[in-house]
Every structure is written in structure tokens, then in C-alpha cells.
A protein has these predicted regions:
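Alpha-helical interface subdomain recognition
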Residues: 1-90
Length: 90
């Protein structure tokens, strides 16, 4: 459901990019949606591992750290929301 939506939207954006038609707003929406989805999904996985999820010996710890930074570099989620909001005239 959410994952399928993310894949479909990323496919649409990839096609638009290769055709030179990807707008900044669409790119911002894609980054915003997929990074927030990634954070929610990896948080649930971390929860399943309990305290082990925070130990560096387990891959889930690295995945959580890597997933968290996705919403920061390249423009924070808040900046992506600003870009989308400008397109909506807000």
C-alpha cells in the first residue's frame, strides 16, 4: 500500500526526470514522502528488535541511522514542505 505508492511515485518522477519534465515541487514531494515513509518503516523494525536495535553490532542500528539522515541531507523535510507549499500558493 504505502510502499506501492512510493514505488509508483518514484517511477513517475524518474520518468519525468529522464524526459526533462521533473519539477522542483514533484522532486520535493518524492523526497518528503519517501524519507518519512522510510523513517516510519525502520522505526517499526527497530521496535521489533528492542534494545538490540540500538547496538552497533546489529545491522538494524546502522539502517536506522542511515534512514534518519535521509530526511536531513539534500534538504530537510521542513524545506521540502516549504517548496511544496509555495507551489500551492501557501
Amino acid at each position: 500500500t504505502e510502499l506501492e505508492f512510493a514505488w509508483a511515485f518514484i517511477d513517475k518522477c524518474s520518468l519525468a526526470l529522464t524526459q526533462g519534465e521533473l519539477s522542483a515541487e514533484e522532486a520535493a514531494m518524492a523526497k518528503w514522502w519517501t524519507t518519512e515513509f522510510q523513517k516510519r518503516a525502520i522505526d517499526e523494525c527497530l521496535q521489533l528488535h528492542g534494545g538490540y536495535g540500538y547496538m552497533n553490532e546489529y545491522p538494524i542500528s546502522r539502517l536506522w541511522r542511515d534512514g534518519r539522515v535521509q530526511s536531513i541531507y539534500g534538504g530537510t523535510t521542513e524545506i521540502m514542505k516549504e517548496i511544496v507549499g509555495r507551489n500551492l500558493g501557501l
